[in-house]
Amino acid sequence: MRKRDIFLLLGAVFAITAMVFVQFTTESIETAAWGLSFRQENTAPIGPANPEELARFNAAYLGNTNEKVIYLTFDAGYENGCTEKILDILKKHDAPAAFFLVGNYIEKNADLVRRMVDEGHIVGNHTMHHTDMSALDSKEAFAKELTDLEELYRSITGQEMAKYYRPPKGVYSKDNLRYAKELGYHTVFWSLAYVDWNNDSQPTPETAFSKLIPRIHNGAVVLLHCTSQTNAEIMDELLTRWESMGYRFERIDKLFN
């Protein structure tokens, strides 16, 4: 086979491979539940959609992996007495965070929400009813879940809600990502979390540290639940240990700059 023919053949193979890869990365986020695959300690995990594809929709799960930065985020659908302690510890460490809240939380905990805002944290949109957003059949239904929460937040704080959205339970579709972008939102996933949400079966501090210390990594977007008794108990030591590893904390608005 002549050299010219070999190059033509290789070019065709490359083109087909590229087409298959693009099709895979696009289809991989048609509908999905967010999950992570960790390869080695203190290294960023692999998500179900790659960062470049997510960036097309103003979405991200990971920051700059060349910088020792952590983005703290908390999800909450209700309050059980842990958030005030967590806020105290964040203030002690001068650590900004984002709190993704649902309607029920904002309605019943106006003072805590206002404290989050007053102390420089971001309050993000976790939808009005914590519904499966991928199951909604229209952009209008999707938008209503976000705008209803925006209106509630405005009535409590007198401010506009920051345009950061986290899908309930990490379940999403490509349509959801597109709708969020069209509504001016950034979709925020995560690159580190652990099973801290079950109040009937809280992990021990030792279990929590065994997940959160070896898996921390540059540019980590950390998801924790501020309903967790364990998180409230370990937060001071956790932030101290991460700081001793050379990490600093930044707000998620820096994630998209």
Residue ranges and their predicted role:
Residues 1-73, 79-92, 207, 238-241, ...:
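N-terminal pre-catalytic segment of deacetylase/amide-hydrolase enzymes
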Residues 68-70, 80-82, 91-206, 210-223, ...:
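Metal-dependent polysaccharide deacetylase catalytic core of the NodB/CE4 family, i.e.
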Residues 85-86, 177-179, 235-236:
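Short amphipathic alpha-helical segments
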